[in-house]
Amino acid sequence: MKFTLHKTNGMARRGTMTFNRPQGEFTVETPAFMPVGTYGTVKGMTPEEVRVTGAEILLGNTFHLWLRPGQEIMRQHGDLHDFMQWHRPILTDSGGFQVFSLGKLRKITEEGVKFQNPINGERIFLSPEKSMEIQYDLGSDIVMIFDECTPYPATFDYAKKSMEMSLRWAKRSRERFDELGNKNALFGIVQGSTFEDLRKLSIEGLINIGFDGYAVGGLAVGEPKEDMHRILAYVCPQLPADKPRYLMGVGKPEDLVEGVRRGIDMFDCVMPTRNARNGHLFVSNGIVKIRNAKYRNDTTSLDPECDCYTCKHYTKAYLYHLDKCGEILGARLNTIHNLHYYQRLMAQIRQAIEEDRFEDFVVEFYKKIGKSVPTR
C-alpha cells in the first residue's frame, strides 16, 4: 500500500491509498468510509451493489471469520476476496475488540486471550501471532495489530498497564507479520484511554516499531464526545503525516465530519447498515425514521438531494409499506440508501478539502441537520 497526501485544509487531509492486487492497481480516495462486512458480506448486499454506492474498500472481521467458516475453508477458496467475490481492498480488524467484549467469558494473559467460543462453547486462544496468521490467510490488504481495547471508564493505572501490554503485543504482531513474509500493510493502534500522556507514550512506542498506518483505538466506547474530540485533536498531529490515520468503529455522520476536522483519513462503522435494517435512514437534513406512521401516505422520495437507486425509484410510502410487511426488499433498499449517503458525504468532504472550503462545508452540514458546530 502506498499513501499519498495531496492536500490539507486546516487539519483536514485529502489523500489516496494505492493497492497493487492480482487484478490490478486499486485506489482508495481519502477521507474514506469503509462499510462493514462482518461475516464476509455487507448484510443484504452483493459486492456489485456495495461498489455502486461508491465504496472502494471494505472491513472484514477476523474474529468471526476465524470461528466461522474458519481458516481452512478460506484457504480452499484462495482468500477472503475470492470467498466473498470482492476483489478490491479489504481491511480486517485483529479480533481484539470482539474478544474483549466477551467479558467474563475471556481471560487475558501476557501471551494472549483465552476465551469461550460463543458458537460452541469450546475454549480457544487468540494471540498476536495467531491474529497475524489468520489475517494472512484472509489475504487482508490492511492488517491490524492485536491489541487490548481498553474499556471505558478505566483508571489511569489500568489504562497504563493495558497500553503497555498493547505495545508489547504490537511488537509481537510486527515480528510475526514479517516472519510470514506478508507484503501487505500493517497498521498500529494507539491506545491510552482518555489520558493524553498515555496516548503520547503509545504513539512513541508504535512509531519506534514502525507501521504502514496508524489507527486510533479505544474511542467510541462510551466516553463523552468532548473526550473523543480532545483525544483526536491531541493524537493526530503527533502521527506521521505521510501515513494514513484510521478512527476505528466510528460512527455517526457528525463523527465522520469531526474526525476529518481533526486529521483522520479512514472510518468504519456498522451504523449505516444496522440502522437501515431498523428503518433509521440518514438524509441531507437529518434523519428519517421510516416506521413513523406519518410516512404511510408520503409520495415523496427519501432525499431529494440523493441520487441512489432507492431515492430515484421509490417513495417514503413504499419504504414504509415494505417495513410494515417485514419485506426483505425494504431492508435492502434502506441499506442501499444509507451506504450511498455515507459515501456521498465522504465525496463532499473530499471536494471541500480540495477547494479549501472545508470549514464552510462543516458549517453548512450542521445547519442542514439543525445542530450547532462543536468547538474544537
Swiss-Prot record:
GO terms for cellular component: cytosol. Zn(2+) binds at residues 306, 308, 311, 337. Its EC number is 2.4.2.29. It is an enzyme of class 2 (transferase). Its cofactor is Zn(2+). One of its GO terms (molecular function) is metal ion binding. Transmembrane segments: none annotated. Pathway: tRNA modification; tRNA-queuosine biosynthesis. Keywords: Glycosyltransferase, Metal-binding, Queuosine biosynthesis, Transferase, tRNA processing, Zinc. One of its GO terms (biological process) is tRNA wobble guanine modification. Residues 249-255, 273-277 are annotated as: RNA binding. Binds 1 zinc ion per subunit. It catalyses: 7-aminomethyl-7-carbaguanine + guanosine(34) in tRNA = 7-aminomethyl-7-carbaguanosine(34) in tRNA + guanine. Substrate binds at residues 93-97, 147, 191, 218. The keyword tRNA processing applies. The active site is at 93 (proton acceptor), 268 (nucleophile). Homodimer. Within each dimer, one monomer is responsible for RNA recognition and catalysis, while the other monomer binds to the replacement base PreQ1. PANTHER family: QUEUINE TRNA-RIBOSYLTRANSFERASE. NCBIfam families: Q_tRNA_tgt, tgt_general. Belongs to the queuine tRNA-ribosyltransferase family. Catalyzes the base-exchange of a guanine (G) residue with the queuine precursor 7-aminomethyl-7-deazaguanine (PreQ1) at position 34 (anticodon wobble position) in tRNAs with GU(N) anticodons (tRNA-Asp, -Asn, -His and -Tyr). Catalysis occurs through a double-displacement mechanism. The nucleophile active site attacks the C1' of nucleotide 34 to detach the guanine base from the RNA, forming a covalent enzyme-RNA intermediate. The proton acceptor active site deprotonates the incoming PreQ1, allowing a nucleophilic attack on the C1' of the ribose to form the product. HAMAP family: Q_tRNA_Tgt. This is Queuine tRNA-ribosyltransferase. It comes from Histophilus somni (strain 129Pt) (Haemophilus somnus).
